A protein has these predicted regions:
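Conserved SAM-binding loop
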Residues: 1-81, 175-180
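S-adenosyl-L-methionine-dependent methyltransferase catalytic module, highlighting the catalytic core
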Residues: 48-56, 66-179
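Generic C-terminal helix-cap and adjacent flexible tail
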Residues: 180-186
Length: 186
């Protein structure tokens, strides 16, 4: 099962994957307690209401089930979704945008959120979940590796080592795992 907001993409995906539906994260079209596992990969930063989307993820996960989510890290030195400069969108990894104060960052990147450690966890406050694991992880550098194998390998090895040091806070994404409480039947 999966959701997508764009109808054309649902049609494309449905050729190979029959259970893709058009829906928004804030209103998942599934009954309560439906899934053993809910997986969200770099999506929650794009929705209109991230707290509502987090609540929906919990709602459709059965008691004892797992939620796995990845979301952008506010301390990563690049905004990976591009940014707006003078009303013009610039695609790519834009340095230091995420390190700006909120009002400035939101002017350059109004189309996407990036989360602090506490900020991503705060989305699930008041929900019947227990935090199982939360780390910040570095990227795999697949695109660089495809063009420059040695450089990609060097970056990957060095930064994967950084994940086990205080430098992990500067990684690309939050990797968060939550378990829905057994007493949380919807």
């Amino acid at each position: 099962h999966g959701i997508e907001v764009e109808e054309e993409r649902v049609a494309e995906a449905s050729v190979e994957l029959p259970n893709i539906v058009q829906a928004y994260g804030e209103a998942l079209p599934y009954p309560d307690d439906h899934f053993d596992l809910v997986f969200s990969n770099e999506v929650i930063e794009h929705v209109d209401d991230d707290r509502r989307t987090a609540a929906e993820m919990v709602r459709v996960t059965r008691p004892g089930g797992i939620i796995v989510a990845f979301a952008p890290n506010r301390l990563y030195p690049f905004e990976t979704h591009g940014a707006y400069f003078g009303g013009r969108y610039v695609f790519g990894n834009i340095p230091l945008v995420n390190w700006l104060p909120d009002p400035l960052r939101d002017r350059f990147a109004p189309h996407v959120r990036a989360y602090t450690m506490k900020g991503i966890e705060r989305l699930f406050v008041g929900q019947p979940v227990r935090l199982v694991h939360h780390r910040v992880i570095y990227p795999g550098f697949d695109n660089i590796s495809a063009r420059h194998a040695r450089l990609g390998s060097l970056l990957r090895r060095a930064l994967y080592l950084a994940e086990h040091t205080p430098l992990h806070v500067f990684g690309l994404s939050h990797f968060i795992v939550l378990r829905v409480r057994e007493d949380a039947a919807g």
